[in-house]
């Protein structure tokens, strides 16, 4: 079995969640499968093994799980990017586009130092609004965003292309055509 099929087979698809017409790609089944989880993290880390990566930034909430594992393997620090109002210390924030409206994310102002090399991690990229906001937030405080990594890309929704337009290399382990 190929890597792509192996990982795809551990992702559960839930139709009509959170609303009719949506196919929700659920990675909790991948996370529960020790072999698949390990393999996915190894593949996310592989291009940067031996490179100088200072921090891994994970987008709330599944990006925390994956980002922590990636940071551990790269011997890098981990930085949570959270919804506004969830961090206790002084923060820097960025608004980002949602399918219907906007939201705001933030991180601690001292979590990344100017010039530090950062990899952004989340479970899935769809329209790219959240990831684009995270890249802009990291750049706002002077980080060099080396890449953005995801388990899943939904290429028909254009998010990866949006990040590439910002000169951010994108690594996704699998893709699901359609929504």
Swiss-Prot record:
EC number: 2.4.2.7
Subcellular location: Cytoplasm
Pathway: Purine metabolism; AMP biosynthesis via salvage pathway; AMP from adenine: step 1/1
Record-linked Pfam families: Pribosyltran (PF00156)
Catalysed reactions, semicolon-separated: AMP + diphosphate = 5-phospho-alpha-D-ribose 1-diphosphate + adenine
MF (Gene Ontology): adenine binding; adenine phosphoribosyltransferase activity; AMP binding
Task of the protein: Catalyzes a salvage reaction resulting in the formation of AMP, that is energically less costly than de novo synthesis.
Designated name of the protein: Adenine phosphoribosyltransferase
